[in-house]
Curated annotation (Swiss-Prot):
It comes from Methanocaldococcus jannaschii (strain ATCC 43067 / DSM 2661 / JAL-1 / JCM 10045 / NBRC 100440). This is Putative flagella-related protein F. It is found in: Archaeal flagellum; Membrane. InterPro entries: Flagellin_arc (IPR002774). The keyword Lipoprotein applies. The modification N-acetylcysteine is found at C19.
């Protein structure tokens, strides 16, 4: 009788250790995923808060609009990831070009001109990659 209770207790302890190890591995990977998601979210919020673009000049004709944007923040942005809206309508990518053409990134304290071949707008909205919206009214 004494031998079977020792074996039973040993089996129970081993089963508890295996379950504990499995639970630890599962919870550790879960918390690692949560931590990674929080880090990504924090970096996105940090970039969004430190992005400050200013529409400094708009020159518009019937078929072309030149929009000069100045980066007054501390975050490097990519102008080709901007979404441009004229009077609430999204301007297609093929109608947008940039001057200077080789400038892929807009660094702080620098400006870029976006050339839009589209109808003349009365309201312009530029949505950055971080989700910030910048408005300009021609009226």
């Amino acid at each position: 009788m004494g031998f079977s209770s020792v074996v039973g207790a040993t089996v129970m302890i081993i089963a508890l250790l295996v379950c504990g190890a499995y639970l630890y591995v599962t919870m550790d990977s879960y918390y690692e995923n949560v931590d990674e998601a929080y880090t990504t979210y924090y970096s996105h919020v940090h970039a969004k808060l430190n992005e400050k673009l200013v529409i400094t000049d708009v020159k518009s004709s019937t078929s072309q609009t030149n929009i000069t944007i100045y980066n007054n923040g501390s975050v490097v942005v990519e102008p080709d990831k901007f979404t441009i809206l004229f009077d609430g309508t999204v301007v297609p990518e093929e109608n947008i070009s940039y001057y200077p053409k080789l400038k892929k990134y807009l660094v702080p304290l620098d400006s870029i001109t976006i050339v839009v071949n589209w109808t003349q707008p009365s309201r312009i909205c530029i949505v950055s990659d971080n989700g910030n919206k910048y408005f300009y009214s021609l009226t």
